[in-house]
Amino acid sequence: MRHPMTFALAAAMLAVLSGSALADKYEGTKKCSSCHKSQGESWKSTAHAKAMESLKPKVKAAAKTKAKLDPNKDYTKDKDCVGCHVDGFNKEGGYTIASPDKFLAAVGCESCHGPGSKYRGIHRK
C-alpha cells in the first residue's frame, strides 16, 4: 500500500460518518405516550413533566432563592441549568438551546430509557 496514512484517515472518516448516520434519535414523551398511554397520562402530572417550567422567571421563586438564584431571571437558556431539565441535552438528536424542541423540553421517558428511536424495532415485533 503506497499511502497507509491516507487509507487510515479515510477509514476513520467513514467510521465517524457512518456512526452519526445511525445515531439513535430522541423523539419526545409525546411519541412514547402514543403507545404507552397510561404512563404518559401519569407522567403529565409529575414534576418531571414541568421541569423546564421551573426555569422560567418568577416560577418556583422560593426554591430559586433558597438555591441562591435570582427568582426573576430566565434560566431556560442557561446551559448550566437546562441539562437537568430536558431530554438528551446537547446529545445527537436531543434538546439544544440553539434549536429547542418542545417535545424534549421536560424530563421525560428518554431521560432514563435513552433515545426513543432505538425501541421502534423492539416494539414492532
List the predicted regions and their residue ranges.
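N-terminal export/membrane-targeting signals
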Residues: 1-23
